[in-house]
């Protein structure tokens, strides 16, 4: 990877350490950063352009795409069971991989499925929204809702890798793009004056 032009950050968590790759076009070059010579379940939702999941699947030796309905309602036991059944029907084993391609709902659902399938298999998160890139894809928190109670059933299951491809933001509705930047504003207020200064200038597309 001598020609890699991007940013790599490492979350130092001992045995559960993982890298965060920030690079335009990283999604279609996932094979450069991850082992895809195994069965891969690519989990996405109906609101994410289908081409993103397909780009990942096309790089894998053996893959299946699992598409769930868009929205918070997909963080349910019913949808979780659907994902797990499709993984089982795909004959996934302990050495196989789940890749989430989408926003926070997809990351939470796919990550939790990976955490509990066969007591835990590898998981890669590829966030496609500003909020999930900045916040929910990092930290290893995975969960589903129970009735009206959000994120009450879950697990801490760190991904093996997080791929942040800013090119995917080109298809994100403008209001979702701006709403997700609230987490970046908060980070700037707490720890990064230079970042906060960018928001003060109103230059949010830099």
Language-model regions, residue ranges each:
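Catalytic nucleophile loop
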Residues: 107
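ATP/NTP phosphate-donor binding region
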Residues: 2-97, 186
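A glycine/threonine-rich phosphate-anchoring loop and its flanking beta-alpha core
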Residues: 112-205
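Acidic-aromatic/histidine active-site loop/patch
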Residues: 104
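Hydrophobic residues within alpha-helices
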Residues: 56, 110-113
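Short, basic, helix/turn surface patches
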Residues: 91-101, 150-156
């Amino acid at each position: 990877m001598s020609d890699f032009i991007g940013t790599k950050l490492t979350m130092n968590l001992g045995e559960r350490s993982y890298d965060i790759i920030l690079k335009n076009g990283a999604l279609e070059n996932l094979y450069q950063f991850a082992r895809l010579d195994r069965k891969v379940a690519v989990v996405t939702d109906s609101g994410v352009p289908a081409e993103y999941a397909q780009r990942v699947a096309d790089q894998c030796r053996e893959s299946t795409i699992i598409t769930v309905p868009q929205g918070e309602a997909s963080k349910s036991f019913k949808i979780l069971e659907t994902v797990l059944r499709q993984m089982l029907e795909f004959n996934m084993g302990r050495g196989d991989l789940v890749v989430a391609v989408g926003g926070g709902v997809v990351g939470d659902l796919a990550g939790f499925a990976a955490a509990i399938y066969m007591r835990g298999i590898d998981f890669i998160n590829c966030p496609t929204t500003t909020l999930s890139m900045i916040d929910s894809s990092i930290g290893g928190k995975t969960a589903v809702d129970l009735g009206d109670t959000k994120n009450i059933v879950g697990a801490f299951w760190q991904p093996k890798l997080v791929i942040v491809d800013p090119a995917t933001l080109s298809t994100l509705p403008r209001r979702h793009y701006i709403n997700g930047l609230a987490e970046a504003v908060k980070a700037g207020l707490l720890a990064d004056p230079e970042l906060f200064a960018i928001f003060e200038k109103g230059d949010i597309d830099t």
